[in-house]
Structure formats: C-alpha cells, structure tokens
C-alpha cells in the first residue's frame, strides 16, 4: 500500500479511467493522497481564443487523448468514485496569450516566447516573496475553470 499515488498527464490517456482509479483505491493506505494533473480542456479562454483566431479544436488529439477534463468534471468524477478533493489548483492560462493577439497555435516561435513570459511571470513573483500570491492566483483560476492544467490532491472519503 502507498501513502501517495500520482497521475500527472495520465488520466486523459486511459481507455477506462474509472477502472484505473478504482484499482488505485485498492493500493492506497488510509489517509493517502491521490494527486492528479490533467489538461484543462474546453475552458473559456481556450474556446474564445479558438473563436477569435478561427482555429480548430487543436487540443483534441485522438488517439493520444481519450478523455477531456475541466476542473468541475474532474472533481465530479473523483467525488463519484469516493474521493474528497482537498486542494485544486491550475497552472498559467497560456490561452490568455491568444486573447492578447499572440497566435502561438499557428506560430511555434510565439509558443516559445509565450512560455518564457509565463516562466518570467512566476519567477518574478517567487523572487519577490509572492509565492503565496501565486498559489492563491492558481487556486482562484481553478475555481473559474481556467488555467492550462488542473491539479487536484484528494483523499478517500
């Protein structure tokens, strides 16, 4: 049995995520943590950026991605399977750059630039003692179903 199980960028690839989570439940110790990180698809920034730039749903990627989650759908899925979500966070909403007019989907060079801006944003806050602000920012984004990734930390009820 384990104190913690992590699924980082895994759940969206599984043919039967419910079966997999139920199997994981069998190997968790009491009060163990299940940590999951998935892409936050179909969020408002993503779909608006798609519409503004006339893009296809570039994030739909079969056969690699079989499941698509938002914060709400991930939390509902886990609660249905007997988990209580203790913490929910997101990551930087890269799709925001699309709304700024930077179409990184069409131009890979812009993608690298947007990534560097995101890294600089986080580094500047951390270097200036604002780590708690950054954490609260990402939790607030998760509550709005925004952010590139959604991370949850949960326990069995």
Predicted regions and their residues:
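Conserved SAM-binding loop
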Residues: 1-53, 63-80, 151-157
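A C-terminal cap/extension of S-adenosyl-L-methionine-dependent methyltransferases
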Residues: 90-157
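A SAM-dependent methyltransferase catalytic signature shared across enzymes that methylate proteins
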Residues: 71-91, 124-130
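N-terminal start-of-chain detector that recognizes signal peptides
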Residues: 38-40, 58, 122-128
């Amino acid at each position: 049995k384990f104190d913690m199980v992590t699924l980082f960028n895994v759940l969206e690839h599984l043919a039967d995520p419910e079966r997999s989570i139920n199997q994981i439940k069998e190997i968790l110790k009491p009060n163990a943590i299940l940590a999951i990180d998935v892409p936050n698809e179909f969020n408002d920034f993503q779909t608006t950026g798609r519409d503004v730039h006339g893009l296809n749903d570039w994030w739909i990627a079969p056969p690699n991605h079989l499941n698509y989650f938002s914060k709400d759908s991930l939390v509902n899925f886990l609660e249905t399977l007997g988990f209580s979500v203790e913490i929910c966070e997101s990551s930087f909403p890269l799709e925001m750059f699309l709304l700024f007019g930077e179409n990184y989907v069409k131009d890979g060079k812009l993608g690298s630039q947007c990534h560097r801006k995101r890294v600089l944003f986080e580094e500047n806050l951390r270097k200036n003692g604002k780590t708690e602000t950054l954490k609260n920012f990402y939790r607030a984004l998760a509550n709005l179903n925004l952010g590139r990734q959604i991370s949850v930390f949960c326990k069995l009820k």
